[in-house]
Amino acid sequence: MQPAPTFGRDSVQCLLANPKGLRSHYASAVTDEIIGHEVSVCGWIASVREHGEHLTFIDLRDSTGVVQCVISDRIELHPEWVIRVVGRVSKRPGGTENPTLPSGQVEISDASLEVLSKANAVPFSVSDQKDLPDEGVRLRYRFVDLRRARLQRNIRTRAQINKAIRHSLESFGFLEIETPMLWTPTPEGAREFSVPSRLQPGNFYVLPQSPQIAKQLLMVSGFDRYYQIARCMRDEDLRSDRQFEFTQLDLEASFVTQEDVREFITQAVSDATQAATGQSNLAFPSITYREAIARYGSDKPDIRFGHEIFELSDLFAGSGIRALDQPSVGAFIAPAKGEFSRSKLDQLVDRAKALGAAGLLWFRIKQGTDGSLEVDSPIAKFLKNEHIAEIVTRLGAKTGDVVLAVSGEFKATRSVLGTLRTELGRANLELEGLRYLWVIDFPMFEGLDDAGNPIAAHHPFTMPNADDFELMFSDPLAVRAQSYDLVLNGWELGSGSIRIHDPKIQSDVFKALGISDEVANQRFGFLLDAFGFGAPPHGGFAFGIDRLAALLCGEDTIREVIAFPKTQSGLDLMTGAPKQIAKDTLQSYGLAISESQKKA
């Protein structure tokens, strides 16, 4: 993961410049530049130390940092009490300075103290990063957990990311427009949260899983460039990178090409990255979907390391080696930390089988007694010298390397090898930095349904590649879409596409998907009706703010960059949500809980 950035630079600077109310200064503004000045500071007691009968040292923490205060009295104080201290800034005695703090050269001495609020014993230390309790305890007391410097930094960094995105897009002429939170059901793939209507009994709104259709309607409405930092809801199974409610940057623009859209997003993400980490001038290379699958076995490859996959089927065609004489033979040099033991190789074979492969072949490159290269492999006796030489040359292998290979159908081999490559690379290599990648030219369709109709890879409004229109009905799985994904360190940040604005093309896509005119009008009638009034060519993109913030903050889970997240089972441990509601409230919506649900 990316090393954590210094927290909240811009927001803290704004605070330091604008103290108000009960305080004259924030903690981090109490420096050697104001020695001799009288100041008042407010915050929480981070620690308290008594020296003798008449001296108390307090570390006062506020939202900007910590400052040491010296009270010439012995007072009963406890951690996390809220206090106000008034005193004079003086230089710390020699040898007691703390160079890690902005205020570490000084202290507030001869101070008077006012207790603003007492606190119960906290369930865990706010200052301790190592010995944190179970995440459930942290989420139950999230208001305490959020006092920790790491989470304070994360939330502030996230705010800077949003600020940078807004500034970047508005420099391109984008307009921030809010779209409805109560929306009509649309089949966009994920399960939606339903909201009953009290005034229209028996009818329901849904909470939007994305503003996809709304933003296209804005293009028809003549708003040339739209964006929104949008709250979205999906009632789906949760994991480390998912929440029921999430935030995404949503963007749409008229009269643009996909290159234009990628330029907008590249600049916005670059600016957000610089705001969060200080890094600038990062590269955003692009590869096609087919190239990504062929070289990395994934449509979201982690390019922080090489170890690319090479095709070897031509080398073994007609060789008679059954395990290798297959339509596709993919191979890569396994990322290693030290030497692979035989037991580790056996584990990799089992892992490949668990991923769906018939097996996994391995070749350990070694030097023979005569200086030539040889291989240690379960099928070594079947390999000719020219096979070994070509494997070494094609993959760039050297003595000690282990080559892993899977044979079979192309798509299946690449899927297994891509997973192994990612798992081994992240486990065995020191991966640092941020590596963005655009993946373009995705398939328009993925697989066939039970009726033999192609399944839309994204949504049915994605524009096909102009060169592939003629394949729509003859070979739909070969049709490429004008769609594109942005990947960071092997994580898909978001995706976008050029949309269909031509009713004829839209009709053809619906027909290819097996969607009749009647069903299309039932599902999307209001959008299709709008397109009949003049729709501009348009395209857009959306990416997850939560995921981007987690990656830029060096966190493994998005829960660490969300103020009040749910658990992986969708519970809010702090508030107790979700909860039952009163029977009369249910009745006002025309709802009742069935007996089977009561027992569930």
Predicted regions and their residues:
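Class II aminoacyl-tRNA synthetase catalytic cores and aaRS-like
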Residues: 1-600
